Amino acid sequence: MSRVAKYRRQVSEDPDIDSLLETLSPEEMEELEKELDVVDPDGSVPVGLRQRNQTEKQSTGVYNREAMLNFCEKETKKLMQREMSMDESKQVETKTDAKNGEERGRDASKKALGPRRDSDLGKEPKRGGLKKSFSRDRDEAGGKSGEKPKEEKIIRGIDKGRVRAAVDKKEAGKDGRGEERAVATKKEEEKKGSDRNTGLSRDKDKKREEMKEVAKKEDDEKVKGERRNTDTRKEGEKMKRAGGNTDMKKEDEKVKRGTGNTDTKKDDEKVKKNEPLHEKEAKDDSKTKTPEKQTPSGPTKPSEGPAKVEEEAAPSIFDEPLERVKNNDPEMTEVNVNNSDCITNEILVRFTEALEFNTVVKLFALANTRADDHVAFAIAIMLKANKTITSLNLDSNHITGKGILAIFRALLQNNTLTELRFHNQRHICGGKTEMEIAKLLKENTTLLKLGYHFELAGPRMTVTNLLSRNMDKQRQKRLQEQRQAQEAKGEKKDLLEVPKAGAVAKGSPKPSPQPSPKPSPKNSPKKGGAPAAPPPPPPPLAPPLIMENLKNSLSPATQRKMGDKVLPAQEKNSRDQLLAAIRSSNLKQLKKVEVPKLLQ
C-alpha cells in the first residue's frame, strides 16, 4: 500500500479535507499527487539519483563526453603553441645580443692586433677594415643625431597642429567655414607626419641592410686572412724541413771533404733568420685565437690546469723518498704518505716494490690515498719477502675483501708484522671475508694489533682470543729471553771471579819475586803441607710454606671454608667424648644393654 492511498483514507475520514479536495481542479490534483509521490528506495540506485528532478528548465542539449575532451585538447594545444612562440622569441633575442657582443669583441681584437700582424710579417698594414669601422661608427653617430632632430620636428609639428585646431574650434562658433579649414589642416598635418614616419623607418631599414653587408664583408676578409696564415705556416714548416735536410747533407759532405766551416756558419745564420719569422707568426696566431676562445667554454680550462699540474708534480715529489727506500737509507725508518692528494696507485705500487728488499723501514702508512686492490696485491707480495716492517696502515681506502684476504694470506709467511689497520674502507668486507680472516689468523702467532671493527660477533670473539693468545706467547718469549740473559751474565761472572789465596799457594809453590813487607800469619802455609780448612756449612733452608694457608690467602673471603679457619682448642664434653667413642668403635666391641623401663 502506497502512502497516497493512506493519505486518501485519512482524507476520506476527515470531512473538511474531503470538501477541500472536491473544490480542487484536476491540474491542482496532479500537482498535489506529484508532491506526495515518493519513490520507494532502491539499494542498487545511488542516493543522489533516488530523488526526482525538480528543475523546471529544459536541457539545452545532450552531454557528449568525446566532444568535451576534443575541445579541451584543442585549447591545451593552443596554449602550448603560444608558450613555445614566446620562448622562441626570447631565444632569438638572446642570440642576437650574443652575436652583437661577439662582433664587438672581434672588432676590438682586430683593432688591437691588426698593426702588430702587419709589422711582424713585413707586409703593408691593411687600413681598409679600420676605415670601414670608423666610417660605420660615424654613420651610426650621424644617424642617431639625424634621427633626434627629425623626431623633435615631428613632435613640434604635432603640437602646432593641436594649437591650430584649438583656435579653429573657438572660431567655429562664429563661422562654419573655420571648421572646414581646421579639418583640412588636420588632415594635411597627419599626412605630413605619416610621410615623415615612413621615411624614418625606410632610413632605418637601409642602415640595417648596410650593416649586414659590412658584417658579411668582414667575415669574408677574416676567412681569407686565416687561409693566408695557414698557407704561411705550411710554407714555413716546409722550409724548415727542407732546410734541415739540406743542412744535414751539406754538413756530411763537408765533413767528408774536410772543408766547410764557413758554409756551416752561413747555413746556421739562414736557419736562425727563418726561425724568428715562424715564431712570430705562431705568436700572432695564438694571440688572434685567444680572444675568440673567451667564450662560455673558457672557465672550464683553468680547472683542468691545476689537476694536470698536480699529476705532473706528483712524481717529482715522491722521487727522492723512492730512491732513499731503494738505496736502503738507514735514516729512513718510516714511509708515511697519509692524506696525500697528488699520489697515484702507480706510485704506491712503486713504493711497495721498493720495500720488498728493504731492511730498514719499519712503518708503512698509506691512509686516505685512494689505494685499491692492485696496491693491496702488491703489498701482499711485499710482505712475503720483507722481514722488517712491523706496522702497516691502510685506513680509509678503496680496498675490497679480495685485497684484504690476499694480505692476510701473505701473513702466513710473515713473522714480523705486529700491527695491521684497514678500517673505514669504501667497500664493506662482509661476513664471509670476516670468517676467512678469523681462519687465517689462527695460523699466525705474531700479529698483536688489528685495526678493524668486525660486524659479526663470532669472528670478533675469535680474533680477540687469537690476539690475546699471541700477546701471551710474546710475553713468554720475553721472559725466556730475560732468563737466558741473566744466566749468561751469571756464567760470565763465575768466569771472571779471582781465585782464593790458598788455591794460588797450592798451584804455585815458587815464591813471588815481590815479597810483601808485612807477611800475614794466616796466609803462610805450615810446614809439612797441612790440609786447608773446610768451607763453612751452608745456611739452613727456609721452612716449607703451608699450602692451605697460601690457598686461603689467594682465594676470596667468600669462597673460604669455615672448617679451614684455625680455631682455638676447647675442652670436650662427656657427650662429645661418647660420640667420638661410638664413631671409633665397631659392632663387635659394642655390648647389648637392656632398654630402661622409662623408654619401654
UniProtKB/Swiss-Prot annotation:
PROSITE patterns according to UniProt:
WH2 (PS51082)
Instruction: Report biased composition (Basic and acidic residues) as residue ranges.
Output: 80-127, 134-240, 247-256, 263-292, 472-497
Which GO terms are recorded in the biological process aspect for this UniProt protein?
actin filament organization; actin nucleation; muscle contraction; myofibril assembly; pointed-end actin filament capping; positive regulation of actin filament polymerization
Would you tell me the Gene Ontology cellular component terms?
Answer: actin filament; cytoskeleton; cytosol; membrane; myofibril; sarcomere; striated muscle thin filament
UniProt keyword annotations, A-Z:
Actin-binding, Cytoplasm, Cytoskeleton, Disease variant, Phosphoprotein, Repeat
Region listing for Disordered, in residue ranges: 38-61, 80-324, 472-573
Q: Cross-referenced InterPro entries, in alphabetical order?
A: LRR_dom_sf, TMOD, WH2_dom
Q: Where in the cell is it found?
A: Cytoplasm, Myofibril, Sarcomere; Cytoplasm, Cytoskeleton
Which of the residues bear the PTM Phosphoserine?
12, 85, 135, 555
Region called 5 X 4 AA approximate tandem repeats, residue ranges = 508-527
Q: Give the source's domain of life in one word.
A: Eukaryota
- Where would I find the sequence repeats? 165-180, 181-196, 197-212, 213-228, 229-244, 245-260, 261-276, 277-293
Instruction: For the region 8 X approximate tandem repeats, give the residue spans.
Output: 165-293
Q: Which residues form the WH2 domain?
A: 574-593
Note the SS bond partners: none
Q: Which disease is it linked to?
A: Megacystis-microcolon-intestinal hypoperistalsis syndrome 3: A form of megacystis-microcolon-intestinal hypoperistalsis syndrome, a congenital visceral myopathy primarily affecting females, and characterized by loss of smooth muscle contraction in the bladder and intestine. Affected individuals present at birth with functional obstruction of intestine, microcolon, dilation of bladder, and secondary hydronephrosis. The majority of cases have a fatal outcome due to malnutrition and sepsis, followed by multiorgan failure. MMIHS3 inheritance is autosomal recessive.
**PANTHER family membership:** LEIOMODIN-1, TROPOMODULIN
Q: State the protein's purpose.
A: Required for proper contractility of visceral smooth muscle cells. Mediates nucleation of actin filaments.
Q: What family, per the record?
A: Belongs to the tropomodulin family.
Protein name, entry field? Leiomodin-1
What organism is this sequence from? Homo sapiens (Human)
Q: Which gene encodes it?
A: LMOD1
